[in-house]
Amino acid sequence: MSVILFRKQRDTEEELGYAESHCHTVKYRTECPPGSLVYGRYSVMPYYRELDEELRIRGSRLINTYGQHKYIADFDYYYDVAEYTFESWFDLSMTRYNGPFIVKGQTNSRKHLWSTAMYAEDKRRAVEIARDLRNDGLIGDQRPVFRKYEPLKTLEIGVNGVPFANEWRLFYLGTKRISQ
């Protein structure tokens, strides 16, 4: 049986309604029936590892194990897709490229503060942004990631200079595209 473990929040009520109308949805981990495949929605952080272990003890499992989550969240997947995505560095001394850059944490960014906390015209500014992100409550413990800025086709410019672009994400299982 598949179950969505959904932590209800004020800004996710509409999504919860859709989930409840299409899937078996629970609000508490203790409501997950034994033998369930559990999709965590707003419910796994900050105790992902503990949830993974607890569900396993109860005979269920998360759709993504804690290890799989860490592989994505810690940006460890980069080396597996490096030839297909924008060049990235964890240490700017490892590149002669001088900018522009996108600066973010391994997992999170401050995209809504594009012009002051994400986009850097050059290395000097990228280092400054990374230093400032160290004091950020959400990103401070994450390793900084410096990505080569590649301008995409901009559809419009939003608040704080955030470009809305024609960006596509494709998902594959092996060699078969399963979603876009």
Residue map of PLM features:
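Short, well-ordered alpha-helical microsegments
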Residues: 12-13, 46-52
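Short, surface-exposed charged micro-motifs
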Residues: 169
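Active-site nucleotide/adenylate-binding loops and adjacent lid/helix of ATP-dependent enzymes
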Residues: 4-6, 32, 42, 50-166, ...
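Structural motif
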Residues: 36-37
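Short, charged N-terminal beta->alpha structural module
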Residues: 1-28
